[in-house]
Amino acid sequence: MILPPKVIHPTGEPEFTLKKSVISALIADTFNGKIHIEWEPQAQVTTLGQLAFFIQYLKVGHRFMPWVEECPLRYTSPNAPKKINVLGSFVLSILAGYTRYAHITRIQGDCVNAPLLGMTKVVGEDSARNALKAIEENEGIAWLQKHLYQSYSPLLELPWILDADVTIKTLYGHQEGATVGYNPHKPGRPSHTYHTYMIANVRLILEVEVQAGNRSSSAYTAPGLWTLLDRIPRAHWPAFIRGDSDWGSDTVMSEAEQRGVDYLFKLKKSPLVKKLIHQYHCKSGWEKTHEGFEAFATELKLITWKTARRVVIVRRRLGKDRAQAPSNALPHQFSLVEPAEDLSAFEYSVLVTSLDAEVITIVQHYRDRADCENNFDEIKNQWGWCGFVTQKLAPCRLIARMIALVYNWWSLFVRLVEADKHYEAIVSRPLLLHGVGKQTQHAGQTTLTITSSHGRESYVKAAYMRVCAFFDELKAIAPQLTPLQCWYRILSEAMKKYLKGAVLKPPDLINYVS
């Protein structure tokens, strides 16, 4: 009897194929009856349906591709992600309002906007985080500073005001530079300090420096200010520098006077400043300003000052319910309420300035500085300055400038749509960015169909028709223009409220390049 051959390699246990139930749809019982819900993972749709208009703006203005090409990100591995995929992922996540690297996962399935930016895919959070670590810090800062300057430099031909201030970013881990310092929101909690320089009124970021949490005074902000001014041509310097009471030191003011730039700061209420308030409290000659404020101009020389300087005492009458000092005041605490002859009371502040403008103008200039806090509130809470944290300080410095750059790009783009006012991101994103976009292709033509649930959809459609008409006119003459001249044309349209019919003229290209 011939036996069957032995099996050298047993087949093992037989596999039992289980029938997998394919769920075609789910049923949800709603107040409007039952509905059938299906998923379509391969559909070419996006929740940022109106982003295509912003991408056109970046392309016509020559903002995105030069920024990508000049990025000092270098990989040696053949499996490393493409540079444009990394930077494009950052732009998409920042525009969407994300605040953590992990949030990039939310847009990894966006197969519509990524190709529009020239990308092949959206990278993961680890690739994005490691990319910033791979950029040499000094090279990365110089790269971002250059493109930040290019985003706003045409506007510096107009008279402008430089606001300098510091904001605190509270930290909850063990990051480099996370030290305990001045932190009014979370006392005793470690933080980083963001030393920021802004263009007043138009709310654009000139530069931002991230430092340790215990370096919040103007002594650490001023060196960056002077370095920034050194990079700006002298003819484009601000009309004056504006800062809070931390800037009213002799060191800062002497440096400003030596450089020939005017300033407007607030003074701390030192004993001599309090004495000055007592001295002029009952004097006549106070000038009425806006909204119940009064001002008196004089001179003051503090002990630490090398020379006397012009100061403006500002006061406002308090209501009767605020006229008395609080009963729970600390011992030796100075009360700002001084009794007047008519038994009313005032609150005081003292400004120091090198400007020779009228008192009313100076007071209004400093009151306008309150918009600086609105800028901080927007970019911290509606963009990403409160997030994107890493263990090392260098990536934090790079991402802070990257967020400022995308913020500038978006703010100027929104001005193209609505030139009369600044829309914060909490308003502009739902209005001009969000919307379901479905991409279809037929006969070689790609169509993006947008569905917006915003109540002002008709306004947005009309606004984008105007923007597209402007870009069509610009593209018609673009072959005759340089990238710099195209950007000047775009900013002239975006800032027409401030230009009042004028057009920004680019510099002589030969001298500009040299």
Role assignments for model-derived ranges:
Residues 1-50, 55, 64-514:
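Anion-binding and metal-coordination hotspots
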Residues 57-59:
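Plant-biased, long, compositionally biased intrinsically disordered regulatory regions enriched
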